[in-house]
């Protein structure tokens, strides 16, 4: 159900997610959803956002040993797959939680973005970017990629992701101490 919730949130936002619909899709009684998620929809949304966050953090950490170009590409490719598989109907559920009507989800989105920031900062520092600059660049990577996901959805094209990755790679390369 958590994976299903993440998909619904990515496509329609937090408000589109319904426990009843997810229970029907999963083929489980509605009561069992409240057994597993006693805090209801809010808990399921937060767990879905944390799951996606952890998956992306793991991708960044695994790619770190292959260099920042690979890290940037892996980060963008994660969202490219989501966009293309959904025919550009879905984006990032973390971003959806960040702008949700219910402010309870903002804290979880902030935690996930902080995890991505930390993983990207480490990858950038490992590649020779000075520590202070690495933190700022990591935030730029997250912001630019999230923006590119929105642009890609609107244009129904992955071109914004490609352009952002190319520009970020140039920016990172120029930030390395030589």
What is the role of each PLM region?
Residues 49-55:
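Short, basic, alpha-helical segments at the C-terminal edge of helix-turn-helix-like DNA-binding modules
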Residues 59-90, 138-141:
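Hydrophobic alpha-helical connector segments
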